Amino acid sequence: MVRVSVPATSANLGPGFDTLGVALELRNVIEMDETGIDDVVIEVEGAGAGALEDPGRNMVYQAARLVFQRLGYEPNGLLIREKVAIPVARGMGSSAAAIVGGLVAANALVQKRTGGPGLDREELLRMAVAIEGHPDNVTPALLGGFTVSCMDPDRGPLYLCFPPPRGLRAVVVMPEVQIKGRKTEQSRGVLPAQVSLRDAVYNLNRTALLVAAVAQGRTDLLRVAMQDRLHQPYRAALVPGMRSVFEAALSAGALGVALSGAGPSVIALVAESAEPVALAMEAAFQWAGSNARSLTMDLAREGARVLSGPGREQDMLDRPPHWG
């Protein structure tokens, strides 16, 4: 059996639409093994239990199947156990975690059974992006840290990873808002086909500032660097109270605030006490008519990990540069 942990992620971080992402220290654990019986059995505990056990709808299995096909390996029956801590369809990278977890677990299982090298980090990332359609969540889910990524038509996904500034934490507040239909498609559907040059320059300024601020540990710049005009103003109608929640977070001491991915969750970055920020954001959502709950977590410096035993972790991917 192999065990893999994979982190939640938050994409965009305000201005970096489909480009920026960060890994969060909230993890799903996936166990995978051959059973000797010609069948696929999926067990899910936590978020998604009762809805994700069908192999045809399970992203972990669908991703794993692609690895087996790529490596020419036919498992002798398959058991997948998922302990799901990442909320589903809340803007915290649940689909990216499932995809990356399935790829990494299947790769590790084939390595264990055959003794072969399996797929390297770059191959796994290319597969993850091909499944997900964009790199902003799957890159930090696989690699950890703060990531900048883009797609090149010739070279595929290109990325850089940065360690998150020390002491920075995330408060994620999840309103009880249901976005009709498929969440990501609905959230993209409200975006305009064109934006003004003024707004495009505004976002370029802040995306560049945000990357530099993270790289240099200038958390004092996050308030401005996480501002956006490209997607959040248009998605506000899908998240009642969003602007008030942003204002409440900043007034309570957050360093910066943004929609988490396509929403409806909102992420605030904090350096000191997280509780006042979480309470203020929850209250703002409640004032707007939505109950909400919050999670406070560290930013994850590591991405998907193969767990080699109780309490021990083994990185079976090529590691990014040492971050200290």
Curated annotation (Swiss-Prot):
ATP binds at P87, V88, A89, R90, G91, M92, G93, S94, S95, A96, A97. The keyword tRNA processing does not apply. GO terms for cellular component: cytoplasm. PROSITE patterns: GHMP_KINASES_ATP. Its EC number is 2.7.1.39. It holds the Pfam family GHMP_kinases_C. GO terms for molecular function: ATP binding; homoserine kinase activity. InterPro entries: GHMP_kinase_C_dom, GHMP_kinase_C_sf, GHMP_kinase_N_dom, GHMP_knse_ATP-bd_CS, Homoserine_kinase, Ribosomal_Su5_D2-typ_SF, Ribsml_uS5_D2-typ_fold_subgr. It catalyses: L-homoserine + ATP = O-phospho-L-homoserine + ADP + H(+). Keywords: Amino-acid biosynthesis, ATP-binding, Cytoplasm, Kinase, Nucleotide-binding, Threonine biosynthesis, Transferase. It comes from the Bacteria. It is found in: Cytoplasm. One of its GO terms (biological process) is threonine biosynthetic process. The keyword DNA repair does not apply. Pathway: Amino-acid biosynthesis; L-threonine biosynthesis; L-threonine from L-aspartate: step 4/5. Belongs to the GHMP kinase family. Homoserine kinase subfamily. Catalyzes the ATP-dependent phosphorylation of L-homoserine to L-homoserine phosphate. This is Homoserine kinase. It comes from Symbiobacterium thermophilum (strain DSM 24528 / JCM 14929 / IAM 14863 / T).
